[in-house]
UniProtKB/Swiss-Prot annotation:
Residues 1-22, 79-96, 161-189, 253-275 are extracellular. This is P2Y purinoceptor 3. GO terms for molecular function: G protein-coupled ADP receptor activity; G protein-coupled UDP receptor activity; G protein-coupled UTP receptor activity. The gene is P2RY3. Its main location: membrane. CDD domains: 7tmA_P2Y6. It comes from the Eukaryota. It is found in: Cell membrane. InterPro entries: GPCR_Rhodpsn (IPR000276), GPCR_Rhodpsn_7TM (IPR017452), P2Y3_rcpt (IPR000371). GO terms for cellular component: plasma membrane. PANTHER family: P2Y PURINOCEPTOR 6, PURINOCEPTOR-RELATED G-PROTEIN COUPLED RECEPTOR. Belongs to the G-protein coupled receptor 1 family. Receptor for extracellular UDP > ADP = UTP. The activity of this receptor is mediated by G proteins which activate a phosphatidylinositol-calcium second messenger system.
Length: 328
């Protein structure tokens, strides 16, 4: 039986969390089995075409790197939850795994924001030259700034996340130990605002402007925009899907959970209901590590063509070998 103790003010609650033993290992296993090869392929494809890097593919490379680093930590979490929250890997590893999760989460959000701004400039300001003058050099500097901001935002995870003891078993707390919930609250809310709400607002502003241009009559749109229309629409759809599945539900339930667990007078059933809602959305926040490579596939024509060529070649070889086997 998986149980968690929670203390808030005068309340001392014990949560029943058997669902984590099934849901979390299942989702994390899917993310690991799909995310590891998909992101490795994206990085490999970009590396092979490194002489023809564009600003978008540079952002995609950094996005795939963040995803790949995160999915490599998932076997530890899969083991943890299949063993009823038992964490045998030590306090530093606990902190580092939680740090990887939030670094990937907010890094993905910021790199998707950069990609959206890049696409916005191409659609709404196709003749502007200021963002093209330094080209790839400026893009690499932006990526370095994103990594710096994300690491700085997530470093307090090493302070708050830690191991603890529940029912004589070592566990790894995600946000903070229950007795530090009040001190974690300001940081958790600040991280949500700076790491999710502000980038999300920027993405919405870009997409609203892009939608206005894309919905204009054909004769009012330049030829350069015509060529980018389908690509932009695909990107908008996929980014909206990523936010709908991975980012928005997680941050909504996390914010509510932070508020209720800092309230000393709420009854235990209410605390448990919000804890379950938050912990059910947490594994789906990892799904962006699978969805991000799909974004790359549908927005990069050369990658689609090379992938189809590889699949056709493999299929032809299989049919050839199959015919030889039966022919003999």
């Amino acid at each position: 039986m998986s149980m968690a103790n929670f203390t808030a003010g005068r309340n001392s609650c014990t949560f029943q969390e058997e669902f984590k033993q099934v849901l979390l290992p299942l989702v994390y296993s899917v993310v690991f089995l799909l995310g590891l090869p998909l992101n490795a392929v994206v990085i490999g494809q970009i590396w092979l075409a490194r002489k023809a890097l564009t600003r978008t593919t540079i952002y995609m490379l950094n996005l795939a790197t963040a995803d790949l680093l995160y999915v490599c930590s998932l076997p530890l979490l899969i083991y943890n939850y299949t063993q009823k929250d038992y964490w045998p890997f030590g306090d530093f590893t606990c902190k580092f795994v939680r740090f990887q999760f939030y670094t990937n989460l907010h890094g993905s959000i910021l790199f998707l924001t950069c990609i959206s701004v890049q696409r916005y400039m191409g659609i709404c300001h196709p003749l502007a030259s200021w963002h093209k003058k330094k080209g790839k050099k400026l893009t690499w500097l932006v990526c370095a700034a994103v990594w710096f901001i994300v690491i700085a935002q997530c470093l307090p995870t090493f302070v708050f996340a830690s191991t603890g003891t529940q029912r004589n078993r070592t566990v790894c707390y995600d946000l903070s130990p229950p007795d530090r919930s009040a001190s974690y609250f300001p940081y958790g809310i600040t991280l949500t605002i700076t790491g999710f709400l502000l980038p999300f607002a920027a993405i919405l502003a870009c997409y609203c402007s892009m939608a206005r241009i894309l919905c204009q009559k054909d004769e009012l749109i330049g030829l350069a925009v015509h060529k980018k229309k389908d690509k932009a629409v695909r990107m908008i759809i996929i980014v909206v899907i990523v936010f709908s599945i991975s980012f928005f539900p997680f941050h909504l339930t996390k914010t509510i959970y932070l508020i209720v667990r800092s309230s000393p007078t709420l009854p235990c059933p209410t605390l448990q209901a919000f804890a379950i809602a938050y912990k059910c959305t947490r594994p789906f926040a990892s799904m962006n590590s699978v969805l991000d490579p799909i974004l790359f596939y549908f927005t990069q024509r050369k990658f689609r063509e090379s992938t189809r060529y590889l699949l056709d070649k493999m299929s032809s070889k299989w049919r050839h070998d199959h015919c030889i086997t039966y022919g003999s």
